[in-house]
Amino acid sequence: MITCFIRYQIDPHKRVEFERYARAWNDAIPRCGADLIGYFAPHEGSATLAYGVYSIESLAAYEAYRARLAVDEQGRENYAFAMRERFILREERTFCEAVDGAPIERPSLPAAA
């Protein structure tokens, strides 16, 4: 299992557009074959750094996933939205694997008070 960390540099004046873009992947990414961990918008510190994180079995599975995403209707619409609105200034992907090889588990969070 590998995890893809997408680092975005976004226009800080178009955070709302980035959030719309991020929410649109909630269905498309899993439908096309990756395990979405989440999208993260700036909160404190830099107003321009955002992240997307998902896991997938291998680089070969990643290539097949990208091909499915390219023909997915919602995926195509979301890519077009990003190109039209130009809120992503830069995007880079890094692929990592867990050091011990174990799958990443999401921690249980305490209930809000």
What is the predicted function of each stretch?
Residues 12-14, 58-60, 99:
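Residues that cap or initiate secondary-structure elements
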Residues 1, 72, 84-113:
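Intrinsic disorder/low-complexity detector
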Residues 9-20:
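Short, surface-exposed ligand-recognition loops at beta-strand->loop->(often short) alpha-helix junctions
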Residues 2-9, 38-70, 93-94, 107-110:
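Short, well-ordered beta-strand segments in beta-rich or mixed alpha/beta enzyme
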Residues 20-37, 56-95:
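An amphipathic, aromatic/His-enriched active-site/gating alpha helix that lines ligand/cofactor pockets
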Residues 16-18, 62-64, 103-105:
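Short acidic, gly/pro-rich beta-turn/loop elements at beta-sheet edges
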Residues 14-15, 40-43, 80:
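Intrinsically disordered, low-complexity segments enriched in polar/charged residues with Gly/Pro
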